[in-house]
Amino acid sequence: MTYLFRFLTVLLAASVFFTLKAEAQVADYDKVNGVLSFENGVGSVTASKHSVLDVSTDHNKLGEHSLVWSWNKKGAYLSFNEAVPYLPENPDPKETSVSSFVFWVYSPKTLEGSLKFVFLKDGKECCHFTYGLGFQGWRGAWVAFDRDMQGIPEIGMDEIRIYAPEDVKKGCLYFDGIIPASFQDVRYHTPDWQAPFINEQTKIHWLVLNNSWKLKLDIPLKDKLSASDLQDMDTVKARFVELITEKAKPYTLKKARQIYDSYDISFNPDGTIKGKPIYFIRYGETFLNLNISDAKATFQKNGQLLRTLNDHLLRIAVSAMRAEDPQKKAEFTRIYLDLTRHLLDQGFEAGSGQGTLHHLGYSMRNFYTAPVIMQEALRDAGLDKKVQQAMEWFSGVGEIKVAPKEPGMDIDAFNTSLMGRMASVIMLEDTPYKYAYMQALSRWIDNGMKHTEGLRPCFKRDGSVVHHKKSYPAYATGGFTGAVDAVWMLSKTGFAISKQSHQNLKDALMAMKFYCYDGYFPLAMSGRHPDGKGTLIPEHYERLAKAGSPDGSLAVDASLLENAPQKGTRTFGFNCSMSHRFGHRLVTIAGHSRYLWAAETYQNANHYGRYLTHGSMQTNGLFRQDGWDWCHIPGTTAAVLLMEKMKSNVLNVDQYSGYEEMLLSDEWFAGGVTHKGVSGSFGMKLHEHDKYNGSLRARKSFFAFENRVVCLGSDIESSLEGAPVHTTLFQNYVEDVPEITFSPYINDRRDIIRNCHSEVYFIQGAQACHTKGIQQSLHEETDKPTEGEFEKAYIEHGDIVRDGRYEYMIFMPADNNDVMFAHDENALEEYSKALPYAVLRHDTSVHGVKDHESGTRAFAVFEEGSVDSMIVSSTPAMLMYSIEADEMTLSASNPDLALYEGPSDEKFDADGKRIERSIYGREWVDNPCGVTYITLTLEGLWDIVEGNGCDVTTSQNNRQTTLVFKSREARTEEIKLRRTSL
């Protein structure tokens, strides 16, 4: 392959330095991209006296060759006469990456001392750093010029020198994949044993491995282990092995040999191993700013990914464990051990940072599992301690050696770190130290399940599991796997977690069962994956049940296994949503606020879902994406745009975030209240972010009683010319529905409309617009055209809207009689003449209704003032009450999460528009929810007869009763009062 051909390939493809040869490992590299991979000789590199340079195939990390340097006298050095394209700032102000030096170095044997890397301009040193040796195999680093090096880097540096350790007379090292200067994400440089000064102030949990390693265990050691102690440790290990092997499929020996051969494993004359270079997938990001965008894909295509090898290792370990033939067992074991040696040699050893290790968890899952199965074989091969230390390093388990300072932990830690940490401790020899380490592990898991404050991860008192600063079921399920498995593994041993933490986990699982549609997440709770595919995992409930009840009184917790329909109404303050159940029906109502984002969008996910929580109301779980109109999410009030214009413009807005969009409102009023556990109300002040249509505002409310929901809207305004504002009633995929033979309109007024699921909408003061047919849309991840047959209905408000409003009620069939009623047009007409509710208020300050069947009155009090004849005055709140004889049940909620006080913290540009900012960079993001108050005055004299644990004070004056509720976390406060006098 000629240089010209390679140059043209780079020029035309604008990407790849990888060869097309089937046997290639990572590829030849064209210097035009800025990486030195030594495929065509030593190039511009020179060596001092008493040292020798060459290229070698003995060891390689990028391409098939590396630079090998041998010296036999102190003071030796290498000189790279290369332009160093350092810049003090990224030319793209949207980028948060910094100029960094990137390299890989291989040491065939352990050398003492440190290398010194010096960067020069016109022969004068500008900056330098030292890099410790003391290892065998590959090591890599990202070193930021301005943050991590000593001295002052300069534009125009033109030479790099690498000095041998001062006191080492002779040695040999290999170098590869050197990038003199490139922009790397400022957040993710990883410190390690060789270069602990790199990004040393980082707090990111993936990157603090060096700090965790240094910690000392704070639990006193027993003098001697009892038989019970040893049995407990054996029980945990046996359960661990059961977990990791129950679904693992063994390989045939033929397949295992093919896998082994694919890694090109061989041994050099000096005994060192060589084979196909292995990369953690995120290392591919190293090349992004070199116009090489597909490095990750190439690693995958060439079979070079860490995750792939780790997955193979688990299945090979299972194959060895289950093999009955001694010869086959021996060969599976040999294959496993050689691949493990290769992985260690590739830099996956204790103390190695590899440049970056951010979000390492998924790739390393089975790095930890297979060794537990193969512990005896590793011990026989003399690899057990080295492997255990690598497990301990990469899992960051050292963090657990000291008691946690605050409750909770990231749900990702349950998902991606917990099993690795447990395996790392299980791999230790059975000593008092291991027992104490197991106690520390149990303490850490227990602490992780404790309730946390504000938006800190992850378990909340309302049953939510918070990730990315909002309730996030899709991440919760992954975390539940680790959490449930851990509780089961430790159950009924001396390491069992506490009753309260066990209960918190159970509550979160039961909450998920409550808010899911037959196991499927509501659209508004699908995070950045609104594809209708996210589900709870039944195995979580089954395994946690086997762990027994939280209080230990039951060997099996059967309540987790019940399949009876869920009942009642619940609000989820940390999701800004309400779930209402009646019969088999579930309604999900969702909003957003100045604390909780409207939608999460990434460059490759949820491009069109910005309206997901614009006051949405989902009545069934039958979502289909093909042809879905993203402008018409049921319940929402939003501007209708061409689908191409709906696509989010995803930016990297600050150093606290990546390329993502998570827009906030500037309004705090968004949330719900429940009444007697069976009905509920939800209200919000909608104000879309200025990034798109900041002129859109509305006040929206929903009042749910049995199989009916009353929906009110007022103060709707928008000035986006040419983009009509619609309040969507429904949108349903109809290709799977039997042919509809009836008209959706019940009358000529078009104020009663029925959909394909026999849901009936009664509209007041407006007509419903209904369409049915093939819809074209765009896929939320790929932008590819999609189509499908849908029906939808909406109320149109116009494009330039002022003081818009709506009122409608939805009737949802909950049994066969309801379905028959929904298809009786005469009955529907009669029903519409005396609907089972009355609107009490529908203005800027208050939305309120009375449900005739239950007698319950419900209000969204947006502004302080009078409410009705009973509630003389109230501060902003969601309120519901019902009276039977002289007793009132009063429910109240202040939807303000109160993470900060005062006006919105938004910042504005020169035109007065809100600037897009990451939620992670807000000063209040880790604050606890503050105390909030609801003050209301009732007509008449009332005494509290049931306080239900509420913090409420009363005072009476002028034949009126004033109540002051003290609350937090947007929870419902419900009390019962008795009238003593009118």
Question: Over which residues does each language-model region extend?
Answer:
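Extracellular carbohydrate-recognition regions
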Residues: 25-50, 192
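Extracellular polysaccharide-targeting segments
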Residues: 28, 164-209
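Extracellular beta-strand ligand-recognition surfaces/modules
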Residues: 100-103, 116-118, 140-183
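Extracellular ligand-binding interfaces
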Residues: 71-150
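Extended polysaccharide-engagement surfaces of secreted carbohydrate-active enzymes
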Residues: 479, 486-945, 955, 967-973
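Short carbohydrate-recognition loop motifs
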Residues: 55-79
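Bacterial Sec-dependent N-terminal signal peptides
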Residues: 1-25
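Aromatic-lined, polymer-binding surfaces characteristic
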Residues: 230-530
